[in-house]
C-alpha cells in the first residue's frame, strides 16, 4: 500500500503562502460553524527556531477557565525529526487571539517505553482533554502505537502559566 505524507515542498509552499517561516497555529471564527472560506485566518503562535517547538501544531480542544482559554499543542525540534512534546497556552477569555501565557519548556515529553518505542518513537501527541473534579485529564498517543492519559490539577497548571509563563 502507498502511504501519503506531506512533502517538504508542500510544507515550504504553505509557509510561503501564509508568510511564516515555521509551522504555526492559526485561528478562524465562524458564527454558524459552516461558513469558513470567507473568514480571515489569524496567526496565533508560530514555531520558534532552535527550540523544542520549532514545528508546532494544535492538539486538544481549548478549555474555558476563569483565567482564560487553556490550549495544549504539540511541538517538535529539528524540523520535525526529533521528539514530539506538549506545551500549553493561556488565551484571553474575551479575545482568544491574545496569548496571555506560553510554556517555555514542554509540560509533557516522551519518557516511558510506550512513548519511546513504536511506529514514531519518542512521541507524545495530545488529542483530547477533560476536567473532572479539578483534575485535567489529557489523552494522548504514545509513539503512534499506544494511548495514554496524563493528569494534573488544573489549578496548578493555570498557576504555573499565570505566574511563570506570562507573555506580557
Name these PLM-found stretches.
Residues 7, 34-63, 96-128, 157-168:
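Surface loop/turn signatures of beta-propeller and other carbohydrate-active proteins
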Residues 130-164:
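Blade-level signature of beta-propeller repeat domains, shared across WD40, Kelch, NHL, RCC1
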Residues 57-103:
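Loop/turn-rich, solvent-exposed surfaces of beta-rich toroidal or solenoidal domains
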Residues 24-32, 85-94, 151-158:
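Beta-propeller blade signature
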Residues 18-23, 80-84:
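Short, solvent-exposed loop/turn segments at conserved positions within beta-propeller repeat blades
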Residues 10-11, 68-71, 135-137:
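Entry beta-strands of beta-propeller and related beta-repeat scaffolds
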Residues 15, 75-77, 142-144:
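Residue-level signature of beta-propeller blades and closely related beta-rich strand-turn architectures
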Residues 1-13:
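Single conserved hydrophobic/aromatic residue that forms the stacking wall/gate
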